[in-house]
């Protein structure tokens, strides 16, 4: 079950999704369940407006020369105590700047704060937060 929401209005867009997963396990192991949700608000700082892509079922790639600001939040609960799996609960807040060089390439600068807790994975701390800054050139296929 993964309901999605997409609203496009001029140079603003809102995306959100809830996801749920159930893994049937064999040999007497209990089924594993995980779930989460994310939300993204995006706006074109330079560029005219967003369009909908029927082929991609989402926001179309903005025009060449567009500069986009994206704010996002993600929550994922990969721990299922009934199944005996404590893979962690993650909260991630991020801010991204995308510059669309052409219709096939973009430059991206992204900051993310990620907090993970409630995990019991070998060689990993049970609680951790990470600040990440990344820059990349991305080819869109």
Q: PLM features: what roles do these ranges have?
A:
Residues 1-141:
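Outer-membrane beta-barrel pore domains
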């Amino acid at each position: 079950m993964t309901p999605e929401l997409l609203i496009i209005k001029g140079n603003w867009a809102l995306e959100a999704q809830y996801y749920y997963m159930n893994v049937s396990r064999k040999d007497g192991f209990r089924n594993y369940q995980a779930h989460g949700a994310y939300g993204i608000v995006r706006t074109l700082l330079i560029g005219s407006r967003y369009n909908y892509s029927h082929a991609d079922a989402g926001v179309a790639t903005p025009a060449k020369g567009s500069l986009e600001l994206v704010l996002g939040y993600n929550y994922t609960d990969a721990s299922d105590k009934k199944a005996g799996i404590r893979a962690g609960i993650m909260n991630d807040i991020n801010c991204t700047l995308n510059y669309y060089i052409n219709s096939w390439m973009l430059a991206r600068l992204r900051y993310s704060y990620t907090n993970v807790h409630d995990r019991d994975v070998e060689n990993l701390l049970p609680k951790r937060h990470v600040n990440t800054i990344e820059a990349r050139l991305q080819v869109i296929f």
